[in-house]
Swiss-Prot record:
Keyword Disulfide bond attached: yes
Membrane-spanning parts: 147-167
Region (Disordered): 282-306, 319-362
Protein name from the UniProt record: Microfibril-associated glycoprotein 3
Swiss-Prot/TrEMBL keywords: Cell membrane, Disulfide bond, Glycoprotein, Immunoglobulin domain, Membrane, Signal, Transmembrane, Transmembrane helix
Species of provenance: Pongo abelii
Signal peptide: 1-19
Function: Component of the elastin-associated microfibrils.
Subcellular location: Cell membrane
Stretches assigned to the Ig-like C2-type domain: 45-137
Topology feature Extracellular, residues: 20-146
Length: 362
């Protein structure tokens, strides 16, 4: 319950009893004025405080318990003896009933010492010159039970309950804020995995509060909340997330399979395990980490070292070792039959061996 509800209850508990007191004062003043107006009729006793002129247009008379009331019959009668009064219970009222409580004088009904049971409808009947009736409602204010004290007690009890509930809520909120601030301070003092655990505890402890409580919480923990958010961001970047990493790795593997990118580390092993091809050439990928040759033309390509590496497809022919030996034997046999060309054949044989050796190395 909010603070303005407490203030409203407090104001109501003060205004209601004051209204009862003011009503009693106004009623007593009205009674005294009406008694002065009714003083023209000398036949009325001086104890009557209300006259027939006090009723309103809807023929209702309001009287306080313990006072006396005079009700006038507004019908025209040739003789006052022809006027008869009856209450709401149907009893005929005269001076003989209840020890002179009701007194009929001319066309007036005087009720002394009005009680709460006297409330109801009072009707006067006229028999001459014509038969007619006139009714007046009497309402009695109940004051013997002291209702003002009753209302004051009820309002005080309601205000006390409201005050206790608000104080309890404020104490709980203050305790919660202290615990939250303590948890944030412990978060700043911890390191590693415990920091993440403290972050979860703080997240559980921060409630979802609206209106003024949110503003109060923001004012109390504004700076530390910003620090906490910054530390959480740094912690989220440093702590690995296994499911996310596995998903990224699976995505990268699918991408590698789609573009068929070979791993340079496994390239040498794949070349060794690959069987020798026949005379038809195959396409091989040259390892970019291979050293440059010591040829004289290599110095002219020093400027290409800083350029981005590119893949070059080279078509080569690979021969088996048995084929190489047979070719070598045939070349040696031919050298015996042609001695004049011994020097040229030897040079061609050496060049062929060097080429075969380089091809086997590749």
């Amino acid at each position: 319950m909010k603070l303005h509800c407490c203030l409203f209850t407090l104001v109501a508990s003060i205004i209601v009893p004051a209204a009862f007191v003011l009503e009693d004062v106004d009623f007593n003043q009205m009674v005294s004025l009406e008694a002065n107006r009714s003083s023209y009729n000398a036949s009325f006793p001086s104890s009557f405080e209300l006259s027939a002129s006090s009723h309103s247009d809807d023929d209702v008379i309001i009287a306080k318990e313990g006072t006396s009331v005079s009700i006038e019959c507004l019908l025209t009668a040739s003789h006052y003896e022809d006027v008869h009064w009856h209450n709401s219970k149907g009893q005929q009222l005269d001076g003989r009933g209840r020890g002179g409580k009701w007194l009929v004088s001319d066309n007036f009904l005087n009720i002394t010492n009005v009680a709460f049971d006297d409330r109801g409808l009072y009707t006067c009947f006229v028999t001459s010159p014509i038969r007619a009736s006139y009714s007046v409602t009497l309402r009695v204010i109940f004051t013997s039970g002291d209702m003002s004290v009753y209302y004051m007690i009820v309002c005080l009890i309601a205000f006390t309950i409201t005050l206790i509930l608000n104080v309890t809520r404020l104490c709980m909120m203050s305790s919660h804020l202290r615990k939250t601030e303590k948890a944030i301070n412990e978060f700043f003092r911890t390191e590693g995995a415990e920091k993440l655990q403290k972050a979860f505890e703080i997240a559980k402890r921060i409630p979802i509060i609206t209106s003024a409580k949110t503003l109060e919480l923001a004012k109390v923990t504004q700076f530390k909340t910003m620090e906490f958010a910054r530390y959480i961001e740094e912690l989220a970047r440093s702590v690995p997330l296994p499911p996310l990493i596995l998903n990224c790795r699976a995505f990268v593997e699918e991408m590698f399979e789609a573009v068929r990118v070979d791993d340079p580390d496994d390239l040498g092993e794949r070349i060794k395990e690959r069987p020798a091809l026949n005379a038809q050439g195959g396409i091989y990928v040259i390892n970019p980490e291979m050293g440059r040759s010591n040829s004289p033309g290599g110095d002219s390509d020093d400027g290409s070292l800083n350029e981005q590496g590119q893949e070059i497809a080279v078509q080569v022919s690979v021969h088996l070792q048995s084929e190489t030996k047979s070719i070598d034997t045939e070349s040696q046999g031919s050298s015996h039959f042609s001695p004049p060309d011994d020097t040229g054949s030897a040079e061609s044989n050496c060049n062929y061996k060097d080429g075969a050796y380089e091809n086997s190395q590749l």
